[in-house]
Amino acid sequence: MDNRPIGLLDSGVGGLTVARELLRQLPNEEIVYIGDTRRAPYGPRSREQIIAFTWDMVNFLLSKDVKMIVMACNTATAMALEIVKEKLDIPVIGVILPGASSAIQKTKTNKIGVIATQASIRSDEYHKTIARKSSAVEVYSLACPKFVSIVESNEMESEIARKVVSESLVPLIGKVDTLILGCTHYPLLRSLIQETMGKEVRLIDSGAEAVRDISVLLNYFSINGQERQPLEHRFYTTAGVNSFREIAEKWLNIGQLQIEHTEIENFNKEK
């Protein structure tokens, strides 16, 4: 047993979709969450910037004595997961492999779509991961850079969101039977995405799929949390505490959240 918290990192509020599923599936686990909202979105950034920003978040979480780090951000996973895993002696998990594996299991036509940030699409990590597991699958990748901004500005239910989603997804309509939401912000637009793609298309939430792997790792390393009350979940953001709180409280549907502003730039530097 290990009652230390699990650390989650994201470029903003998107990783809350992973946090929600983690809290639902693993009720004995405390979490520490860092959202780098000030420097979001990560999608247009260079690989070097994304790696540096990810290290800032990793080192911040290490300062909170976490027992595991979840890269609840597809862009960070694509660019920095293997680099970080090599340097740390605690488990580190990303969201790409779980999402890809689930999509392969669910597709009936072997035609899978991936929507993600520009950086994730450029990295081609989803395509490469799927190809390693199944040579029969065709992958259709599409960058949807406007989606993150809509979520970060809390406009998920606006007419602007509906218009942007419907126009952005046109290249994939009718081509795939399974669609990976390859950015943890995107499940916050799930209803609009489903409406646009059609009810017959299966949507894969990569973050939610990752929680199943988190549970496996907790058991494997014997670091599960004990049943206890109360649990102290802590959330940190580098900008916009009020908007972060509004989205977090609505999405997580739990009482008073402990949310603080923090600075992480060049935090403790890379080891």
Curated annotation (Swiss-Prot):
Q: What keywords are annotated for this sequence in UniProt?
A: Cell shape, Cell wall biogenesis/degradation, Isomerase, Peptidoglycan synthesis
Protein residues bound to substrate: D10, S11, Y42, G43, N74, T75, T184, H185
Reactions performed catalytically = L-glutamate = D-glutamate
One term of GO molecular function:
glutamate racemase activity
Under SUPFAM superfamilies, the record lists: Aspartate/glutamate racemase
Checking InterPro entries in the record gives:
Asp/Glu/hydantoin_racemase, Asp/Glu_race, Asp/Glu_racemase_AS_1, Asp/Glu_racemase_AS_2, Glu_race
The positions flagged as active site in the entry are C73 (proton donor/acceptor), C183 (proton donor/acceptor)
Q: Which HAMAP family match?
A: Glu_racemase
Q: Which NCBIfam families match?
A: glut_race, PRK00865.1-3
What is this protein's function per UniProt? Provides the (R)-glutamate required for cell wall biosynthesis.
Q: Which family does it belong to?
A: Belongs to the aspartate/glutamate racemases family.
Name the UniProt record assigns to this protein: Glutamate racemase
What is the species of this protein? Lactococcus lactis subsp. lactis (strain IL1403)
Upper lineage is: Bacteria, Bacillati, Bacillota, Bacilli, Lactobacillales
